[in-house]
């Protein structure tokens, strides 16, 4: 970070990729990634980025694993999620997180996207 700032890159433009390893091969790495996100965000004060779908490589029902991991990562300080925006569960997880974390003030985005859906 110091080197980047010394070269004229503003701190707010620096994103750290904490790397996502597949849970099927490195299951203990899941919590390490989440802890790294938390540390980068809260101790270093930097923004974070993550390729979310890497977590589920080689597993069945990848969408389920991906959207739960995305929610866990957001809770631990993820700023920029590399996801497939065409998967409703992924965009839904982001919208629900923003609603519950009080980022989506007055639920505007959530209601705009889901207000016409029937209540189940």
Tell where the protein language model's regions lie, with residue ranges.
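Catalytic alpha/beta core domains of metabolic enzymes, predominantly
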Residues: 1-118
């Amino acid at each position: 970070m110091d080197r980047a700032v010394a070269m004229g890159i503003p701190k707010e433009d620096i994103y750290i990729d904490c790397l996502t390893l597949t849970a099927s091969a490195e299951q203990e790495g899941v919590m390490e990634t989440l802890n790294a996100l938390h540390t980068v965000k809260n101790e270093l004060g930097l923004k974070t980025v993550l390729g979310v779908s890497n977590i589920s490589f080689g597993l069945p029902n990848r969408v389920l694993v991906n959207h739960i991991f995305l929610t866990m990562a957001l809770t631990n300080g993820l700023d920029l999620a590399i996801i497939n925006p065409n998967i409703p569960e992924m965009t839904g997880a982001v919208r629900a997180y923003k609603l519950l974390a009080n980022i989506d003030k007055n639920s505007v985005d959530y209601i705009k996207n889901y207000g016409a859906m029937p209540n189940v």
